[in-house]
Amino acid sequence: MAHKKAGGSSRNGRDSEGRRLGVKKFGGEIVVSGNIILRQRGTKYHPGANVGLGKDHTIFATTPGNVKFHKGFRGRMFVSVVAEA
């Protein structure tokens, strides 16, 4: 009876894929309406002028222009789009 019994499987060996979050367009970059500026979980960055906030807290441009990151009320980080002059 020199047989091997069934070996147990490892409890490890699984990991979720990355969610591709983060800044997609950096400060000073030119964007057009509808461009995604950043993807986030929660509002680490808040929407400023000429940007919208999606239901998954994605910040996107509503008008063409340049991306601007700035601090505002209570130290919050805001993202705006400044129209090109």
Curated annotation (Swiss-Prot):
Membrane-spanning residues: none
DNA repair listed as a keyword: no
UniProt keyword annotation of Ribosomal protein present: yes
Pfam family, one: Ribosomal_L27
Keywords noted in UniProt: Ribonucleoprotein, Ribosomal protein
Alphabetized InterPro entries for the sequence: Ribosomal_bL27 (IPR001684), Ribosomal_bL27_CS (IPR018261)
Family from the record: Belongs to the bacterial ribosomal protein bL27 family.
Cellular component aspect of the GO annotation: cytosolic large ribosomal subunit
GO molecular function: structural constituent of ribosome
GO BP annotation list: translation
SUPFAM superfamilies according to UniProt: Ribosomal L27 protein-like (SSF110324)
Region (Disordered): 1-21
Name by which UniProt lists this protein: Large ribosomal subunit protein bL27
Source domain of life: Bacteria
